């Protein structure tokens, strides 16, 4: 078992498996913490498993908790300024995910990782909303190229902050995404149901003394499952988001009222959360998971942990799940081509918060971009072998499905 899978096992909800962490060699923790930082599992590890960690690791993650608590306060203050700017223009909005996940997805908002604030804006006013946020000093990270996915280009505060490898830096300003739809069927190549009523069913939630517009509980869970599924299928899943789903499933296992209203949550995302963290399930959740198409269900039998293992060894096994969910052979061919021959890699920029861009910074950014693309190419090539081997496994499993 890989060390990362030991962490996932230690965070399960169906028993106490924390003792497994003692099997991780002392010298492996440095690399492992870099993985859990990236996967956003460091904070739940600190909260639930501190006494099973080596002393130096425990000291480090307890410091992470304290600094994230300060980050959380600053994030809420940033939200207050943005909300005031939108309200001043009479722009209606709601918040997706983020701090509206409390309390069902996390025990304490101070210890939830959050790096951006996601607004969904009233139809027809998304550009005006971005302009209002821009009045606070936020600018698009990059100019939009081609059709957007679900939101306008990400915006950030150009205040001179620089990334130093610290995921819990209180000085790190949150980024902003302004959404105009909940699901992009043209991009994902299969539909989901229920999004057309999300806006009308929005509610206000009391969070740390403020009234925050948000999705109603059933719609918020549905959107959270779609979010996990979308990122899983594109190979950029944050493991913490799966943990949050498991936390929610475990805490609503006896909530008949909720499950009588929850009609649009994605069963594949719930199955992933159950496979990893084994939450207790309401009968309705289990019934929906059992209703997955046979081929998709078989994928979990073979590749359930592949999205987590991909942090260490790229594999692209999520491609086979996407093929199960997509409709029509033409769409499936598009998915295969998109994953095997990527033509639009993510655009990144070194120190995007820096305000003064001189020739030296331009050269540094160019070198960073070249290095990033080279690393992406290497990761892509490394994934092809495991993908081919997985293809053989999948073909055999699919024939038995």
For every predicted segment, state its role.
Residues 1-115, 121-401:
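Conserved NTP-donor binding/palm subdomain of two-metal-ion nucleotidyltransferases/polymerases, i.e.
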């Amino acid at each position: 078992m890989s060390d990362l899978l030991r962490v996932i096992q230690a965070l399960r909800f169906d028993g106490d498996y924390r003792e497994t962490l003692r099997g991780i060699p002392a010298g492996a923790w440095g690399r492992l913490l870099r993985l859990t930082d990236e996967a956003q599992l460091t904070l739940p590890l600190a909260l639930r498993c501190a006494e099973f960690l080596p002393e130096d690791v425990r000291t480090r993650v307890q410091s992470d908790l304290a600094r994230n608590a300060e980050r959380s306060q600053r994030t809420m203050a940033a939200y207050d300024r943005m909300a005031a700017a939108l309200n001043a223009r009479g722009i209606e909005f709601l918040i997706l995910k983020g701090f509206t996940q409390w309390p069902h997805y996390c025990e304490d908002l101070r210890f939830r990782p959050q790096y951006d604030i996601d607004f969904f804006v009233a139809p027809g006013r998304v550009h005006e909303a971005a302009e209002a946020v821009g009045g606070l000093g936020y600018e698009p990270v990059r100019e939009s190229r081609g059709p957007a996915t679900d939101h306008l280009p990400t915006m950030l505060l150009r205040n001179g902050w620089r990334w130093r490898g610290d995921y819990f830096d209180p000085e790190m300003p949150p980024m902003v995404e302004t959404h105009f739809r909940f699901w992009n069927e043209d991009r994902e190549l299969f539909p989901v149901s229920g999004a057309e009523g999300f806006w009308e069913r929005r509610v206000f939630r009391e969070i740390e003394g403020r009234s925050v517009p948000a999705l109603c509980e059933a719609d918020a869970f549905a959107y959270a499952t779609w979010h996990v599924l979308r990122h899983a299928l594109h190979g950029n899943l944050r493991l913490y988001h799966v943990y949050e789903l498991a936390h929610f499933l475990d805490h609503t296992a006896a909530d008949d009222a909720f499950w009588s209203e929850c009609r649009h949550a994605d069963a594949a995302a719930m199955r992933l959360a159950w496979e990893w963290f084994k939450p207790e399930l309401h009968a309705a959740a289990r019934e929906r998971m059992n209703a997955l198409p046979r081929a998709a269900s078989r994928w979990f039998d073979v590749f359930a942990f592949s999205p987590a293992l991909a942090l260490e060894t790229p594999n692209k096994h999520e491609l086979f799940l996407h093929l199960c969910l997509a409709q029509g052979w033409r769409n499936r061919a598009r998915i295969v081509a998109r994953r095997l021959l990527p033509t639009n890699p993510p655009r990144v920029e070194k120190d995007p918060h820096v305000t003064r861009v001189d020739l030296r910074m331009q050269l540094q950014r160019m070198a960073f971009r070249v290095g990033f693309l080279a690393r992406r190419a290497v990761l892509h090539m490394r994934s092809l072998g495991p993908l081919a081997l997985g293809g053989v496994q999948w073909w055999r499993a699919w024939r038995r499905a």
